[in-house]
Curated annotation (Swiss-Prot):
PROSITE patterns membership: FPG_CAT (PS51068), ZF_FPG_1 (PS01242), ZF_FPG_2 (PS51066)
Cofactor binding, note field: Binds 1 zinc ion per subunit.
Name this polypeptide is given: Formamidopyrimidine-DNA glycosylase
Catalytic activity, as annotated: Hydrolysis of DNA containing ring-opened 7-methylguanine residues, releasing 2,6-diamino-4-hydroxy-5-(N-methyl)formamidopyrimidine; 2'-deoxyribonucleotide-(2'-deoxyribose 5'-phosphate)-2'-deoxyribonucleotide-DNA = a 3'-end 2'-deoxyribonucleotide-(2,3-dehydro-2,3-deoxyribose 5'-phosphate)-DNA + a 5'-end 5'-phospho-2'-deoxyribonucleoside-DNA + H(+)
Organism whose genome encodes this protein: Beijerinckia indica subsp. indica (strain ATCC 9039 / DSM 1715 / NCIMB 8712)
Gene name linked to the record: mutM
Function of the protein: Involved in base excision repair of DNA damaged by oxidation or by mutagenic agents. Acts as a DNA glycosylase that recognizes and removes damaged bases. Has a preference for oxidized purines, such as 7,8-dihydro-8-oxoguanine (8-oxoG). Has AP (apurinic/apyrimidinic) lyase activity and introduces nicks in the DNA strand. Cleaves the DNA backbone by beta-delta elimination to generate a single-strand break at the site of the removed base with both 3'- and 5'-phosphates.
Top-level lineage group: Bacteria
Signal peptide span: none
Length: 288
């Protein structure tokens, strides 16, 4: 499933094309994806102008000029493809056009095609004033890319928790958008074991420890590095221009079971365990 860097990469690719343009046509080719499309989906979008394209957690948010927000989630295999006027572009390899489920025609002549072989993605229309309180968003945690994510916040969120640190970091009600790949990578860079209790990031009086400060900085750094690399293309992820991400070539631990730990002087071996149903990759020697 695309994680925050992949969704943010898609947002940055779509924004220059979508923002300021209007939907002249919307071709909805099936009744549902993961969930049914909203009633009169195409009719409610046609003629509307996109005023901004944002992101909340792993959701893309297109602000429309009628105070509605088009909420889009990529699911497991969703992707957007941009076809500019005059292009003879075809679906990327492995992306059969039969899986092109929504085609947005823009006032600029550009088409944006949503492709989703597994159909776990979905789209909703929500009134802007209702967005924060909507069930999709009302329990979503803080954004990890902003200044809000700092050691003091991690200490406050995790104080007293005996939950394993990696499991706590994946709790979307605490921190939004973090996924398995980038949590594994951040914990290795921070030298912290995924099995240590999350509460150890706070001192006895709830104050942030050095670990909390270090981890918050590294989480932001890993996410920003991944975004600059276009995300990680393991199965389905492509950028809006069809290019692959390449952060997967920088993985230190994720999917590298039995390989030597890349930390200089460590000499350990990357291990794989299962936590809360998810594979965790780490080095038991240098991650404490």
């Amino acid at each position: 499933m695309p994680e925050l860097p992949e969704v943010e990469t898609v947002r940055r690719g779509l924004a220059p094309v979508m923002v300021g343009a209007s939907f002249t046509t919307v071709e909805q080719r099936r009744a549902d994806l993961r969930f049914p499309f909203p009633d009169n989906f195409a009719a409610r979008l046609e003629g509307r102008r996109v005023e901004a394209l944002g992101r909340r957690a792993k959701y893309l948010l297109a602000d429309l000029d009628d105070a509605q927000v088009l909420v889009m989630h990529l699911g497991m295999s969703g992707s957007f493809r941009i076809e500019k006027a005059g292009d003879l572009a075809s679906p990327p390899p492995g992306k059969n056009a039969a899986h092109d489920h929504v085609v947005f025609g823009l006032s600029t002549g550009t088409r944006i095609i949503y492709n989703d072989p597994r159909r776990f993605g979905f789209m909703h229309l929500i009134a802007r004033q209702d967005l924060a309180g909507h069930p999709l968003f009302r329990n979503v945690g803080i954004e990890p890319l902003g200044n809000e994510l700092e050691g003091a916040l991690l200490a406050r969120l995790f104080a007293g928790k005996t939950t394993p640190l990696k499991t706590a970091l994946l709790d979307q009600t605490l921190i939004a958008g973090l996924g398995n790949i980038y949590v594994c990578e951040a914990l290795h860079r921070a030298g912290l074991s995924p099995r240590r209790a999350a509460g150890t990031l706070a001192g006895k009086k709830g104050q942030p420890t050095e670990r909390a400060h270090r981890l918050s900085e590294i989480i932001r750094a890993v996410l920003e590095e991944a975004i600059e690399a276009g995300g990680s293309s393991l199965r389905d992820h492509r950028q809006a221009d069809g290019a692959l991400g390449y952060f997967q070539h920088r993985f230190r631990v994720y999917d590298r079971e039995a390989e030597p730990c890349p930390r200089e002087g460590c000499g350990g071996t990357i291990k794989r365990i299962v936590q809360a149903g998810r594979s965790t990759f780490f080095c038991a020697k240098c991650q404490r």
